[in-house]
From Swiss-Prot:
TM stretches of this protein: none
Gene this chain is encoded by: Ccnh
Organism: Rattus norvegicus
Region (Disordered): 296-323
Phosphothreonine PTM sites in chain numbering: T315
Pfam families hit by this protein: Cyclin_C_2 (PF16899), Cyclin_N (PF00134)
Presence of keyword Transcription regulation: yes
Lineage: Eukaryota, Metazoa, Chordata, Craniata, Vertebrata
Annotated GO MF terms: cyclin-dependent protein serine/threonine kinase regulator activity; kinase activity
Name used for this protein in its record: Cyclin-H
Subunit structure as annotated in this protein's UniProt entry: Associates primarily with CDK7 and MAT1 to form the CAK complex. CAK can further associate with the core-TFIIH to form the TFIIH basal transcription factor.
Record-stated family: Belongs to the cyclin family. Cyclin C subfamily.
Length: 323
């Protein structure tokens, strides 16, 4: 399972600082490519800085979760979690200046539906966009064009271990082996809220699914005034391993701090950065050096020859019916 997975080996990182370095490196590499192309200067004011890219990623990740939350038919939580993880992984090594997060977020959701075997047709999927039939068709063409790129950038590691299954497992375990808590279901709603909030942070890239699930349950218990330390020491048999117990408590504290310090992007800042992003993707700046590179394919047969203006007619406002 998780401990033998590609997620543990390749997509679980040691620290927030390591994630920041990866994102800064992706930003730097794109700037170098754009400058080498001869179209822009090294200090061009339209370049986005790493912290600006992060703000845009936060915004589009939130849009991704909103899109999934109102999706029809209802999207399983595992699919939502997988889509969210794909998005996080993609922008660890790629810049929003090269690949627009609007289409990447939809491609992540589309691919997650396939991988998690959520049976929804392509027309059904784009039917959730607030667009004309022609606009939905264009959006689907873009999604299909970017799908292989996304798979490649994920290094073909498509199986995602979400915290939802261990979360249910812990609740069952508490019901059967922890009689001190009569009705563990009272923890569910607040724990679900915690899982929704932590999904917006980098926790999925730093901690194991079971650690996230357990933190959600114990945080919910704490908010309800219920002490569950004895569950860790007795039921999970950590009483004799004080070092392991101490490490687990430190991890849970770090996760709670991640949630506390998360700041949603301010709408005013996002509006400015979105304008900057659109200029990065405009044909006159030519930061997307080669059309087929922008599409992510090396074979000309895969590349859509549609002009840029037609391709980008749909906008963020077209993402969902009910936002």
């Amino acid at each position: 399972m998780y401990h033998n997975s590609s997620q543990k080996r390749h997509w679980t990182f040691a620290s927030e600082e390591q994630l920041a370095r990866l994102r800064a490196d992706a930003n730097r590499k794109f700037k170098c490519k754009a400058v080498a192309n001869g179209k822009v200067l090294p200090n061009d004011p339209l370049f986005l800085e790493p912290h600006e890219e992060m703000t845009l990623c936060k915004y589009y990740e939130k849009r991704l979760l909103e899109f999934c939350s109102v999706f029809k038919p209802a999207m399983p939580r595992s699919v939502v979690g997988t889509a969210c993880m794909y998005f996080k992984r993609f922008y660890l090594n790629n810049s929003v200046m090269e690949y627009h997060p609007r289409i990447i977020m939809l491609t992540c959701a589309f691919l997650a539906c396939k991988v998690d075997e959520f049976n929804v047709s392509s027309p059904q999927f784009v039917g959730n966009l607030r667009e004309s039939p022609l606009g939905q068709e264009k959006a689907l063409e873009q999604i299909l064009e970017y799908e292989l790129l996304l798979i490649q950038q994920l290094n073909f590691h498509l199986i995602v271990h979400n915290p939802y299954r261990p979360f249910e497992g812990f609740l069952i375990d508490i019901k059967t082996r922890y009689p001190m808590l009569e009705n563990p279901e009272i923890l569910r709603k607040t724990a679900d809220d915690f899982l929704s909030r932590i999904a917006l942070t980098d926790a999925y890239l730093l901690y194991t699914p079971s650690q996230i699930a357990l933190t959600a349950i114990l945080s919910s218990a704490s908010r309800a005034g219920i002490t569950m330390e004895s569950y860790l020491s007795e039921s999970l048999m950590l009483k004799e391993n004080r070092t392991c117990l101490s490490q687990l408590l430190d991890i849970m504290k770090s996760m709670r701090n991640l949630v506390k310090k998360y700041e949603p992007p301010r709408s005013e800042e996002v509006a400015i950065l979105k304008q900057k992003l659109e200029r990065c993707h405009s044909s006159d700046l030519a930061l997307n050096m080669v059309t087929k590179k922008r599409k992510g394919y090396e074979d000309d047969d895969y590349v859509s020859k549609k002009p840029k203006q037609e391709e980008e007619e749909w906008t963020d406002d077209d993402l969902v019916d009910a936002l």
